[in-house]
Amino acid sequence: MELNPGNPIFDYCVLPCFIFLARVTDVSIGTIRVILLTREKKVIAASLGFLEVLLWVIVITQVIKNLNNALCYLAYAGGFAAGTFIGMILEEKLAIGFSLLRIISPRNGDEIANKLSEAGYGVTTMNGQGSRGPVKIVFTVLKRKKIGQAMTIVKSVEPDVFYSIENARSTNTAVSEDSPGLLRIGILEKILKVRK
């Protein structure tokens, strides 16, 4: 038995699975593309945009050719939902870019700053006034992949410390070579030989 259009196995099993998987891929790529745009990775984002739209055109063509097949609609919508979820997980795992970690400590700000500095993080501190008295504010810009490591250091000094994390849209590379915050060219950028 051949698996061609018109064959029930193809129409109601293979085609919906193809549409679902292609849609998961194209939406996941789209999620990563948007994040790369916010990180000013223009060439990589444009390349992913091309691939994303190419996949979308292939998928929508199959859906339009099979308007009487409700499974194609469900596969299209399900692929979009799953692709959004998977794209967010991928973005979390890739942890592209830098973040600003702001720590506000009424008691142990200097010790937190020293521990982070000893671990190789660039640290800036300043005195502040909180609603309950004086505080020390500690800032560090670090790779997103290193947030967990930095927070382990911070929490070892003061487990209930107040902190906030913001995405840093762009940074310069005025950081020492061994710092966990140093910008390095990624593999995809090396392949594409992208330069700002």
From Swiss-Prot:
GO CC entries: plasma membrane
Localization terms from the record: Cell membrane
InterPro entries per UniProt: DUF2179, DUF5698, N-reg_PII/ATP_PRibTrfase_C, UPF0316
Protein family (similarity comment): Belongs to the UPF0316 family.
Membrane topology: Multi-pass membrane protein
Main location: membrane
Native source species: Leptospira borgpetersenii serovar Hardjo-bovis (strain JB197)
Transmembrane segments: 12-32, 44-64, 70-90
Signal sequence coordinates: none
Keyword Transmembrane helix on entry: yes
Pfam families: DUF2179, DUF5698
Protein name: UPF0316 protein LBJ_0597
Keywords recorded for this protein, A-Z: Cell membrane, Membrane, Transmembrane, Transmembrane helix
Keyword Transmembrane helix tagged: yes
Domain of life of the native organism: Bacteria
